[in-house]
Amino acid sequence: MAGAAGLMPVLPAMAGQARLRVAMACPGRRTDPFWQMASSVMQAAARDLDIDLTIAWGERDRSRIIALGKSLVDDQPDYMLVSNDYRTAVPIIQAAQRRDIPSLIAFSDLLEDDISMLNNGDEIRYLIGSLVPDNARAGRIMGRSLVEAIRQAGTSPNGRVSLIAIGGARSTQAALQRLEGLHDVLRADSTVDMLDEVSVNWSRDEAYQRTLALLRRQPQVTGVWCANDDLALGAMQAASDLGRRPGEDIFFVGLNWQPEALDAVADGRMRLSLGGHFLVGAWALAMLRDHHDSRQVQAAGVREVVKLAVMDKERVGFYRQHFSGDAWERLDYRRFRKGDASHGFAVETLLAQLPPARLPDDRG
């Protein structure tokens, strides 16, 4: 990285490299903080990797995402990047298969039913593989950290911890997998009570309204597990409006490294935010560059998982010192290519200048 993080020096330009055309129907809204971060980083990576990248915005509407994906296929790019949020991947991949366009799954993986629908004999034609976040691990870390914070604060005098969970849209794998991680924590600790679990379509306003109702009904709640930062910010506002004190008598965790959430982590209102998975798209583009330059004809079937990193109060200041502003966009993403990247697909390795993450235990 230039200057700001001191991680990745600029590499010499790759001479004679053919430009690629890559397209993606993004499942998110243009206003989603996570997808804003992810798309900005993808555009930066595309510049470094000689890729012409087209991103169309699905606005969290399944029909729109599929229609956009098929339209992008009609433009005949060299590759399609496909996310399976809202179960949209199969029709887009099938459209790409009909035109012999390879696809790579990114951000949200196929389900078993999807694989059965796409399977043609022993393999899925023109599917290179997948690169997805380890959402279940993230959900576990969030759950354990939340319980630990409550116990350390002494807000569970009878030894029991009362939680509620604000999950994301159940039609997205990220929401389901993060909840799966939380449920692992609940099964392992019989002293934790999950009093309520609701799902919202990744909406801060909806998280605010649902949390307001839940805390009015169950004021004994001392922890709110939230599937992402936007939901945590909405839930925190609801708690504050009811006279609760986030970080003192009620605790919150989130995910995405949203700047506003990192403010809350820094001042103690949020226990932590996991993140770094906005880099998935950049890593995916590097994989496509490698796939093209190796002249592979058929799919490799590779499945890679990206481990998210913890941002807590001890680390957030250092993070902002080294990675603030457009620092992520100024990485040299040619370093993400196979053979150049020594860090694999772990965000933590990119954060080497930060203090070590303090996890609740070593099972994360």
Q: What would you call each of these model-derived segments?
A:
Residues 65, 128-160, 207, 257, ...:
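Hydrophobic alpha-helical segments within soluble ligand-binding/sensing domains
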Residues 33-48, 138-145, 173-192, 210, ...:
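Short, solvent-exposed amphipathic alpha-helices that sit
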Residues 80, 84-99, 182, 196-261:
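Hydrophobic alpha-helical
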Residues 94-137, 261-262:
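Flexible loop/hinge segments that line or gate small-molecule binding clefts
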Residues 166, 170, 283-364:
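Hinge/cleft segment of the Venus flytrap/periplasmic-binding protein
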Residues 47-58, 165, 187-204:
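Short beta-strand elements in bilobed, periplasmic/extracellular small-molecule ligand-binding domains
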Residues 21-41, 45, 54-63, 71, ...:
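Extracytoplasmic "Venus flytrap"
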Residues 1-15:
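N-terminal export signals
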